[in-house]
Design a protein with these regions (language model features):
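Solvent-exposed alpha-helical segments and adjacent loops
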Residues: 20-293
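Hydrophobic membrane-insertion alpha-helices, especially the h-region
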Residues: 2-15
């Protein structure tokens, strides 16, 4: 709840002192990029969706009181219902608000600079409160873990990769490249150091009715912080676009999917290496066998 209030306060501050009164020019912020321009020239509302964690209340007989719990293994409605069914005597109820990951504060600060540069506003929503109909008629930027995708898992269902979440913010990503199956693992060993090898994806996808979707997803905080920072800084975004054009016949596509390995110490990663890239066609949803529309 405190984090929710913090982000709400942050957005009100941004709206009042930056959107309405600030002379900010965004010199270090992308303001002439194919990646971002589509979000500001189609006349649709922009929504930033944060992948939040499910919270529930449970009565603890030993303590004699109700506890508020966030369990990393109980994060979807199906997982929650299964937990209730297997523990009928624990008096379990879902809390109406989710817990926001700490990285979301960094992400909002970075993203708002882009919106300031384009002089556009955005709305903040949470993955726990929306369904797939939410993507209709609006642009969406999702930032969160694979674990917190919920309805947005439909958006990446036909992308050319597979992912598996593992305990402790680890996971696997597999894709085919040059006729070979490649599997990468997000890993950290905090018994040795705070060094993290995280994995994440950036997917910019077209909607069926001129919407635009940008999904920045990782297994841990590191990938989300680093990839958002990379997209919101003019120099690093230009470097990424140059790298993409190098592997895409000199062109920067409107839509694409990419996998990144992110390296560095906990919440302070310094390196993002693109491991896989593929252009996404403008008729992406025509290939979707169970269309969300």
């Amino acid at each position: 709840l405190l984090i929710f209030l913090a982000i709400s306060t942050l957005y009100l501050f941004i709206d009042k002192f930056y959107f309405q009164e600030s002379p900010y020019q965004g010199d270090g912020t992308p303001n002439n990029s194919i990646l971002w321009e589509h979000f500001f020239n189609n006349g649709m509302q922009n929504s930033i969706v944060i992948g939040d964690f499910l919270i529930f209340h449970e009565f603890d007989e030993a303590l004699g009181r109700v506890r508020r719990i966030q369990d990393y293994k109980i994060n979807t409605e199906d997982e929650f219902e299964s937990y209730i069914q297997t523990n009928p005597k624990r008096n379990i109820t879902e809390f109406p608000l989710g817990e926001l990951p700490h990285n979301s504060l960094f992400n909002i600060v970075d993203l708002h600079k882009v919106f300031l540069a384009y002089k556009h506003k955005f709305r903040i929503s949470f993955s726990s409160e929306i369904d797939i109909d939410y993507i209709k008629g609006r642009n969406v930027i999702y930032v969160g873990e694979f674990k917190n995708l919920r309805a947005f898992s439909d958006l990446i269902a036909t992308l050319p990769f597979h992912y598996q979440t593992l305990p402790d913010w680890e996971g696997l990503i597999s894709f085919t490249q040059d006729d070979s199956l490649i599997t990468l693992r997000a890993h950290h060993d905090w018994r040795v150091s705070r060094y993290v090898e995280d994995l994440g994806i950036i997917a910019k996808l077209p909607g069926q009715n001129n919407e635009n979707y940008l999904l920045i997803i990782g297994f841990g905080y590191n990938s989300q912080i680093k990839l958002i920072d990379m997209l919101c800084d003019k120099v690093s975004l230009q470097e990424l676009e140059t790298q993409i054009m190098t592997v895409n016949n000199g062109n920067m596509p409107d839509y694409f999917f990419s996998v990144f390995k992110v390296l560095g110490f906990d919440r302070a990663s310094t390196t993002a290496k693109m491991e896989f890239f593929q252009k996404v066609d403008a008729n992406f949803f025509q290939n979707y066998t169970q269309s969300p529309y």
